[in-house]
Swiss-Prot record:
Role according to the record: May act as a substrate-specific adapter of an E3 ubiquitin-protein ligase complex (CUL3-RBX1-BTB) which mediates the ubiquitination and subsequent proteasomal degradation of target proteins. Transcriptional co-regulator involved in the promotion of leaf and floral meristem fate and determinacy. Required for the abscission of senescent organs, probably by regulating the cell wall disorganization in abscission zones (AZs, e.g. pulvini at the base of leaves).
Entry protein name: BTB/POZ domain and ankyrin repeat-containing protein NBCL
Induction: Accumulates after rhizobial inoculation with M.loti, peaking after two weeks and leading to the formation of root nodules.
Gene Ontology terms: cellular component: cytoplasm; extrinsic component of plasma membrane; nucleus
Alphabetized SUPFAM superfamilies for the sequence: Ankyrin repeat, POZ domain
A Pfam entry, by short name: BTB
Organism: Lotus japonicus
Amino acid sequence: MSLEDSLRSLSLDYLNLLINGQAFSDVTFSVEGRLVHAHRCILAARSLFFRKFFCGPDPPPPSGNLDSPGGPRVNSPRPGGVIPVNSVGYEVFLLMLQFLYSGQVSIVPQKHEPRPNCGERACWHTHCTSAVDLALDTLAAARYFGVEQLALLTQKQLASMVEKASIEDVMKVLLASRKQDMHQLWTTCSHLVAKSGLPPEVLAKHLPIDIVAKIEELRLKSTLARRSLIPHHHHHHHHHGHHDMGAAADLEDQKIRRMRRALDSSDVELVKLMVMGEGLNLDEALALPYAVENCSREVVKALLELGAADVNYPSGPSGKTPLHIAAEMVSPDMVAVLLDHHADPNVRTVDGVTPLDILRTLTSDFLFKGAVPGLTHIEPNKLRLCLELVQSAALVMSREEGNANANSSNNNNAPCSAATPIYPPMNEDHNSSSSNANLNLDSRLVYLNLGAAQMSGDDDSSHGSHREAMNQAMYHHHHSHDY
């Protein structure tokens, strides 16, 4: 067993203590009228807040309270007493405990489940108002209870969410980031609000006046930076540069909105006219990622055939390409049409993730967890087909690179050309053999087990109840697909 497997097993063992409720529990919390059983030693070891709360020098009173205004109480409740928690909700408290017990947590609601503040049916809750609210509440709880690792994880999640969230939600995160001195998140959100084009009088209805002033300052700096790249031949034009650039930015925003409406109505000809007549840049407008996520295969194909969009253009802070997005959607049609137009299956995001990595992770989760609520959107046959398509494309590219390298070697060493194989021997190139072995293993794994994993949930009586407990609403997995 590898070190990673050992740590994962240890994490699950501790998490099972929390899931099993009263087993070996020596402390009970009351959150929103519901009891949560936990273990003092684990909480004290993982959180300075709980360490002070449970191990204070004063005699324990009949009951404790985690919500004292001066910070963590040093008074500990007597064994058997119920500790009321009023500062956070039940779901957020369980998410925090899950992180304290296992070191892992997914700070998003389960996909497709009904949520407050989200009226969209079948929403994936990756960047909707409900998902943003849950992340903000989790961040506040992590800061309140001094769980800094969870706070950092939540900040990273929010930074990913706001790229696709509504401008109202971005402003909520902006306020929270200033209140809690989260400078990187502040920078991300302030630039998004600045680029939104909302006039100051509208921003002032949602934000304090000093923040509105900072947003306007950002806009001015951005305008000046763009002006510095453009030669000015007339003093009059220079004098009115700020106004002209602001108008140009508004015009670009209008173009993007028109483009999206055209794509929504499958009017690719209008998009073509905008490219040819108005100079619309499809890559900067994120036309292809938008079409992959919101339009039909035919629209995506027609857009690619215009020849004006880079199929491998990285978009958003994560650097995901359209193929990454199609892989997360588990859409064989989209994956196929992108690969047909030379999408690169080996391209990596900023975090080093390839489309093949995404599909492998989904396959692993599906096989391990079965068709739990968080994975119900995945159809085994579609996942298998997506994996096969991307694997095949990766293998073809690997062989083409091998041919190119072999030909280059032959040209440089003509006398040795007869002894140079077209493909390097598998045992001489560890990386190549590892990659091909992984492809073959993935293929066999999907063929043999993917369909069975979905059907065997009811038959596996020895592990069924345990797996069901492991996949309660507060223990779910997330694959974000922002761009």
